[in-house]
Amino acid sequence: MHRQFFRLSASGLTPAAWEPPVDVFEDEREFIVVVALPGVPIERIEINYESDMLVVRADRGISFAGSSRTLHRLEIPYGAFERRIQVPNARLEAGTSEHVDGCLILRLRKTSRS
């Protein structure tokens, strides 16, 4: 089940790269993109729009690591990631972003501007 939610990246970054799962919704006014990022503070998330791709980058650190602790199991992915999300051809402008319950929620407004 773990592999179902956090896959190693096929984008060619590094062997340690991982991809958080995303959901993309659309209505007549906007696209809503939900990225599961528990443990990643919003200040450490970089969001860009390149061509028709929404690009989300960040680095999740291990918060409980320390020299006096013994690691018994490490299943949660850590390290840098880059997630590229293709947004269907539409003219978009930045809407809002919020971090709710470990998820980054991005709203991209549709526009008719040329």
Task: Give the positions of each predicted feature.
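Alpha-crystallin/small heat shock protein
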Residues: M1-S114
